[in-house]
Amino acid sequence: MTGRLSLPLSLRRLPAAALRILLPSTCALCGDGCDGVVCPPCRARYAAPRTACCLRCANPLPGGGTCNTCTDYPPAYDATVAAVDYGAPLDQLVLQLKFAARLPLAPWFAQMLADTVAARRGLALPDLLCPVPLGRARLVERGFNQALEIARPLAASLGVALHPALAERTTETTAQSGVSPAERADNVRGAFAVTDPDRIAGRHVGVVDDVMTSGHTLGELAATFKRFGAARVTNFVFARTPPHK
């Protein structure tokens, strides 16, 4: 049992246009009928482009640039692209994808990210993309890796090669949401390994995840890639939590 949502084989063989007729869609936020996951009015209201933020950690920063924290204590990653702020009602979509296996949300998350990338002038695309890996036990329990579900359509949209197994989680860490902020760095320290060092040496690696909270998980993964010779690491996350969280 994977927890994936799937259509009967007879429906999966139909063109997308036919499926839209047979399976009319409703907005995931307001419930009104629409052709996509989220209707245009809800997207404009709840998923408008983020205000100016730090180019490195994606925390709000009037005027943009790099925040004092990233200047004084540079994280291992070099840049972060975040499509939306993590808050109501979009936070419920993140939870539905992760814990209710509502996988059709993932391509919409990816499209929001791709739109954000397109709007960010001067952003260098990575040479390859990989998702933040789950531990084996959590992957078996959940049946899928939500970061990979977002990374697949994002890689296709950006025209960047996807390497799903570029890194692996070697330690079954406690979920960061269940750990105090002061303990989060220690919780993920040494949790990752690179499976193919030659593939990342001297290259720009893009890391995909659903949410960035403290940044410790992404920082540890970026540090792991840098130890194996990655030249640059950019995070691509659907949602960024406010600094106070």
Predicted regions and their residues:
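Glycine-rich phosphate/pyrophosphate-handling loop used in enzymes and phosphotransfer proteins
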Residues: 1-245
